[in-house]
Regions:
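N-terminal nucleophile
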Residues: 1-252
Length: 252
């Protein structure tokens, strides 16, 4: 049950900010974000060694893509392709709009259900495959939103119900000055309301089966990417209350 926080600010110097916690079985092998694919030299992404794809990535044209399993679809299944491939396929495109259009035409029956974010400085889309034989594309409006394993801003989802308003009320990061503290604190939070279960925490304690929060990310995309204004990506290679956020080298 990975979770994304998406802040869209059209017209701002930093129109796209993302925060993400990756929840996974801890023993599933993975590598931190880097240029892992020789046939895709423009892509920086985390590497899932089991499936060969990724859960979160960015290309040199600052298209960002992230994949989340939908409820009840954790892990691989016989006869299904890895959903991590979709992140890489999205990052083959130079614009989020063209990526969303191309991925919407894929055969949904080849994959287990997913939520896929594709965004850039201009547009942001949520591609929803709910297991009903169709991939639906939804535009994500300006403002702050959360997406996990159900619907965008789903008030019935324990984590979104617990944290959406907290993120909306928190101090907005200032990537220009590397100030992310409010969002870092929320990503690291293990608190949840008394009436909720532990999965409502933003940062999940590891369960007996090894499932929990295994890494965390903060991403900022500038309006005019270039040598003088590079995107920012901070990565915690473990639960963010125990591992520091370190910058990812995005230079080609």
């Amino acid at each position: 049950m990975c979770t994304l926080v998406i802040l869209r600010r059209p017209g701002h110097d930093w129109p796209l900010l993302l925060a993400a916690n990756r929840d996974e079985i801890r023993h599933r092998p993975a590598e931190p974000p880097a240029r892992h694919w020789p046939d895709r030299p423009a892509v920086v992404a985390g590497l899932d060694r089991t499936g060969g794809g990724s859960w979160l990535g960015m290309n040199d044209q600052v298209v960002v893509a992230a994949i989340m399993n939908r409820t009840g679809s954790l892990g691989p299944a016989p006869g299904k392709r890895s959903r991590g491939e979709l992140v890489l396929e999205a990052l083959d495109h130079t614009e989020a709009k063209s990526a969303a259009g191309a991925l919407a035409d894929l055969d949904p029956n080849a994959y287990r259900p997913f939520n896929l974010l594709v965004a850039d400085t201009i547009d942001a889309y949520w591609l929803r495959h709910g297991g009903d034989g169709e991939i639906r594309v939804h535009t994500i409006p300006p403002g702050l939103h959360m997406l996990s394993d159900t619907e965008l801003d789903d008030s019935g989802h324990p984590r979104i119900r617990s944290y959406l308003q907290r993120f909306r009320s928190a101090e907005i990061p200032d990537p220009q000055h590397d100030h992310w503290q409010a969002w870092q604190d929320l990503l690291a939070s293990r608190t949840y309301s008394a009436e909720a279960d532990p999965t409502a925490a933003m940062n999940l304690e590891e369960r007996p089966d090894g499932f929990g929060t295994v890494s965390s990310a903060l991403i900022a995309v500038p309006a005019y990417p270039g040598f003088a204004s590079l995107p920012r990506w901070l990565h915690a290679e473990g639960p963010p209350d125990r591992f520091p956020f370190e910058p990812i080298d995005l230079k080609g």
